[in-house]
């Protein structure tokens, strides 16, 4: 088994989380299955949510037998590709399906399974404190308009910190990534300069020259840890696990916000209050104390499966992952629990 594969034996239910565009289709799924039946489920996709999938599978295995779940953290883009070509039963993605993708696979279902913060992590020799990054500054770092750590715009936002006169090494994803999609949506929303500089939005974009790249959130975090003078974007759990420094980012209200669970939850609540659809993105939350860079992570599944036992297993695990216990494991890992409104809609759709 590859180190990054999460393969565990689980039982009377297993993975899935579905709903979104047509919850009523779940009513076609059978309600139960024989406890002695063996079921195998395959998933792939998001590295953003991979630690939570791993934790869920491990914990579910404690009290369940008979179902094998595999989840391969290959990135959202590759996970969606495998889902579309039928090589996996479900996929994890930090980006909703495009119109073209939905056309290619009618009846695809999506549901936010968790949410998390995208941090801007850095490794600056001699700087051991939290730095503040104004909105226009971190946009221009990613555009490569700001090249040195002692740039006056960085220094003026951080009085008292002696920045070294050295190049900024930008670390980005080399694979097709929902984390990249969420970041670039945010950057183009907060700054017209993003598009004006010829930058794109999506899971895979052409970055300016002279950047460092790595696969997956884990790879980006490791590259930042090993590269002095570097900065990059990475999901909170990965930055925390490697003890990376994380910047306080200026939010829409003009406040500098450290990535904390409370600040992330405020960001999600500002969006849920406005939109009730489960495929909503949070690109620039308006809360006074909201952390500005957050993303849902979705699970993709089919409305109907030829194997009805497999369909039942997916639905049953979906209920478990939406439970207080399932969401609690996410909180333990630094993810943001889904709001009561989103959980209620999801659970009701599964009942229907």
Locate the predicted segments by residue.
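Hydrophobic membrane-targeting alpha-helices
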Residues: 22, 26-30
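Hydrophobic membrane-insertion alpha-helices, especially the h-region
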Residues: 12-23
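N-terminal hydrophobic targeting signals that begin at the initiator methionine
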Residues: 1-2
């Amino acid at each position: 088994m590859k180190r990054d594969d999460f393969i565990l034996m689980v039982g009377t239910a297993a993975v899935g989380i579905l709903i979104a565009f047509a919850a009523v289709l779940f009513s076609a799924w059978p309600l139960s299955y024989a406890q002695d039946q063996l079921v195998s489920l395959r998933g792939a996709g998001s590295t953003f949510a991979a630690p939570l999938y791993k934790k869920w599978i491990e914990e579910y295995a404690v009290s369940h037998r008979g179902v094998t779940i595999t989840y391969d953290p290959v990135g959202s883009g590759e996970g969606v590709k495998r889902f579309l070509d039928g090589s996996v039963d479900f996929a994890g993605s930090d980006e909703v399906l495009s119109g073209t993708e939905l056309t290619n696979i009618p009846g695809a279902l999506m549901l936010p399974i968790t949410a998390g913060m995208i941090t801007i992590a850095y490794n600056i020799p001699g700087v051991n404190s939290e730095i503040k990054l104004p909105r226009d500054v971190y946009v221009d770092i990613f555009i490569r308009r700001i090249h040195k750590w002692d740039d006056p715009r960085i220094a003026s936002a951080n009085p008292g910190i002696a920045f070294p006169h050295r190049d900024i090494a930008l670390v980005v994803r080399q694979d097709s990534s929902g984390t990249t999609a969420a970041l670039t949506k945010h950057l183009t929303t907060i700054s017209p300069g993003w598009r004006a500089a010829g930058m794109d939005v999506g899971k895979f974009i052409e970055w300016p020259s002279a950047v460092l790249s790595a696969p997956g959130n884990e790879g980006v975090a490791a590259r930042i840890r090993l590269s002095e003078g570097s900065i990059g974007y990475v999901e909170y759990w990965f930055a925390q696990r490697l003890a990376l420094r994380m910047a306080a980012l200026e939010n829409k209200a003009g406040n500098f916000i450290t990535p904390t669970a409370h600040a992330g939850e405020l960001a999600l609540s500002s969006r849920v209050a406005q939109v009730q659809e489960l495929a909503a993105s949070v690109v620039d939350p308006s809360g006074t104390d909201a952390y500005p860079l957050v993303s849902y992570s979705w699970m993709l599944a089919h409305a109907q499966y030829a194997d009805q036992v497999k369909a039942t297993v997916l639905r049953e695990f979906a209920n478990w992952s939406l439970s207080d216990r399932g969401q609690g494991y996410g909180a333990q890992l630094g993810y943001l629990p889904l709001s009561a409104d989103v959980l209620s809609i999801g659970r009701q759709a599964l009942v229907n």
